[in-house]
Regions:
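Core RecA-like ATPase module of SF1/SF2 helicases and allied nucleic-acid translocases
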Residues: 2-181
Length: 182
């Protein structure tokens, strides 16, 4: 929750972003994705934690009760770009569990498009698994990240929010271990 607050503050007060999402925004993949890399040699998958910049954003649309956009994305760590569908509803989600619930709902809505496959659950699942919407990238803004997501990364500047509320760690020792890791 606090990461979302920081990301919104950075976007609106420092970067002067006015739209919900814009070209130039930096996003972090929040769930591994193998679908969009199939047509790119040498790119096995988009990993949870990969940070990408939006080079182009178009065709924002609502479908199945959710919002999607076509995006051209550029890796900040490697020399490649990729075209994919981004699932806009996941950008402001507070937890992976919430995204999992949204994914289940999306599955059910897509299944309604294929009543002829209702008798063959296997064929229905195979069809849905090939949907660009079911495979849309789940992402979050990447201006502020959690301590967990930052592990293994290299950063020029680090600001640690040492909030010592119930959500952070249990007990004083847990807090200091977390702070050491950060």
């Amino acid at each position: 929750k606090r990461t979302n607050i920081y990301n919104q503050g950075i976007r609106t007060r420092i970067l002067w972003r006015e739209e919900e999402i814009e070209t130039g925004d930096r996003l972090m993949v929040s769930k591994n994705n193998y679908f969009w890399t199939e047509k790119y040699d040498g790119l096995p998958f988009l990993a949870n934690g990969d940070i990408l910049e939006i080079k182009r954003l178009r065709n924002v649309r609502e479908l199945y009760g959710f919002r999607f956009a076509d995006a051209q994305l550029r890796s900040l760590d490697y020399d490649w770009e990729i075209d994919a569908v981004v699932w806009l509803d996941t950008i402001y989600s507070d937890s992976p569990e919430a995204n999992n619930e949204l994914h289940k709902q999306l599955f059910e809505h897509i299944a309604e498009d294929y009543p002829e496959l209702a008798k063959s659950k296997k064929k229905l699942i195979e069809t849905i698994y090939q949907s660009p919407y079911y495979n849309a990238l789940q992402m979050r803004f990447a201006y502020a990240v959690t301590g967990h997501k930052s592990q293994g990364g290299q950063w020029k500047h680090v600001y640690v929010d040492a909030y010592k509320g119930g959500e952070l760690c249990e007990g004083e020792d847990g807090f200091y271990r977390w702070l050491y890791t950060a």
